[in-house]
């Protein structure tokens, strides 16, 4: 199991970014959360099997239709055993 914290910069709010991440995370059995931040970025914490988490991270680099991802910061963290996936 791995954990990644992802910060997505660009035009990423108001384009169903969070819901798209949630749906993909549920499809790949990835736990965690995603939220809009005050500075216009989207932040996500993802936990699960390596391949599944990396698929969601790869999606974050592209985003849904309508998003314009400028950059993505990804950091590795120790898994905490999160359960479920929430949108904030």
Residue ranges: model-predicted function:
Residues 1-88:
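Intrinsically disordered, low-complexity, mixed-charge
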């Amino acid at each position: 199991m791995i954990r990644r914290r992802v910060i997505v910069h660009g035009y990423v709010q108001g384009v169903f970014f969070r819901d798209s991440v949630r749906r993909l995370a549920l499809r790949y059995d990835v736990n965690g959360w995603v939220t809009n931040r005050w500075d216009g970025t989207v932040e996500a914490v993802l936990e699960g099997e390596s391949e599944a988490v990396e698929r969601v991270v790869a999606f974050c680099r592209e985003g849904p239709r309508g998003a314009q991802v400028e950059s993505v910061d990804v950091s590795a963290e120790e898994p905490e055993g999160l359960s479920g996936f929430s949108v904030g």
